[in-house]
């Protein structure tokens, strides 16, 4: 007699439990943001989008080796910056402190999300030793968002600035900070102890796109951070950066530029957004070089002391030359 009893199907493998301490990239990171990413037909890159590779005679491998030896991260690597070959090749890097896991999930950014590790007490000294070993005259120090810290990480920035100045007194320091949302007054009071040579905080995009591109951030708050810092340190240059190609209009970018000047921001960067992966926000437009040129001309008319504007410009790209152009170094 035939046995008609159904054979049980193999058990489905249990879904892996969500691990908040793991570094999430691409889909794992963006899947949990409130506004879902809707894919669109991928635009063909125009001929003016060109990345410079490191040359065989460059310092690319030397820089990577030194960074690993000192257990340091760079935003160049973590955010998949297209200029990494050129910058590492010239012996420059933007150091990313406080770990490689961000508490935010911005869907334009390739830095990983997750519950951050405790701060590394040795990081300020390791950073300073690395900068001294590389003989860098201008450095940019940035960080992941650390919403888990009472001061947003401001105290760690100060420790890093102090250590770098101790070991490399002639080196100029630019910091590119998170927004310190919910702890701004505390963070600014702490930064008073060791202000940088340039204070940079990026608005990133126009206010209409904040909910989509910068969940957890606030346009007015970011402007207030820049203005309040400048009020405390009128002799320190302030700086901010924007991406284009996310669906903003020309008029919206010009209005953001006016807002920045109204909040006493001195320096400006504008560059083309490039999608890190198919799970990030799509590129909706490749902005023409003529439009970048117009933004640059308008920036100087508005009174910015320096404007770095172009498709491949990033906030820290040639930051030393930007600072020199603004009279900082």
Curated annotation (Swiss-Prot):
Cofactor: [4Fe-4S] cluster
Main location: cytoplasm
GO MF, one example: 4 iron, 4 sulfur cluster binding
Domain called Radical SAM core: residue spans: 87-305
Any one GO cellular component localisation term in the record: cytoplasm
CDD domains: Radical_SAM (cd01335)
Cofactor annotation remark: Binds 2 [4Fe-4S] clusters per subunit. One cluster is coordinated with 3 cysteines and an exchangeable S-adenosyl-L-methionine.
Name under which the protein is recorded: Lipoyl synthase
Source species: Burkholderia mallei (strain ATCC 23344)
Gene that encodes the chain: lipA
């Amino acid at each position: 007699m035939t046995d008609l009893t159904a054979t049980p199907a193999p058990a489905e493998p249990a879904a892996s439990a969500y691990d908040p301490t793991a570094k999430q990239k691409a889909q794992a990171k963006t899947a949990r943001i409130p506004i879902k990413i809707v894919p669109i037909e991928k635009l063909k890159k125009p001929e003016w989008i060109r990345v410079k590779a490191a040359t065989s005679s460059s310092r690319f491998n030397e820089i990577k080796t030194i960074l690993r030896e000192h257990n340091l991260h760079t935003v160049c690597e973590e955010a998949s910056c297209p200029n990494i070959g050129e910058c590492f090749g010239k012996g420059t890097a933007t150091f990313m402190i406080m770990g490689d896991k961000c508490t935010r999930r911005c869907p334009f950014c390739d830095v990983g999300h997750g519950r951050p590790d405790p701060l590394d007490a040795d990081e300020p000294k390791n950073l300073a030793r690395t900068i001294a070993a590389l003989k860098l005259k201008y450095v940019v120090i940035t960080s992941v968002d650390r919403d888990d810290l009472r001061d947003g990480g401001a105290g760690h920035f100060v420790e890093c600035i102090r250590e770098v100045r101790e070991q490399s007194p002639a080196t100029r320091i630019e910091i590119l900070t998170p927004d310190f949302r919910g702890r701004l007054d505390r963070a600014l009071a702490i930064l008073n102890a060791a202000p940088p040579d340039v204070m940079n905080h990026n608005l990133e995009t126009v206010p209409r796109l904040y909910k989509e591109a910068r969940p957890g951030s606030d346009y007015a708050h970011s402007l207030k951070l820049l203005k309040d810092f400048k009020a405390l340190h009128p002799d320190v240059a302030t700086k901010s950066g924007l991406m284009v190609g996310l669906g903003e209009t020309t008029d919206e970018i010009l209005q953001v530029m006016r807002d920045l000047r109204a909040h006493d921001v001195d320096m400006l960067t504008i560059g083309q957004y490039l999608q890190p992966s198919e799970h990030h926000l799509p590129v909706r437009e490749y902005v023409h070089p003529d439009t970048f040129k117009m933004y640059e001309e308008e920036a100087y008319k508005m009174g910015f002391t320096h404007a770095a504007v172009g498709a491949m410009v990033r906030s820290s790209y040639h930051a030393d030359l930007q600072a020199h152009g603004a009279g900082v170094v």
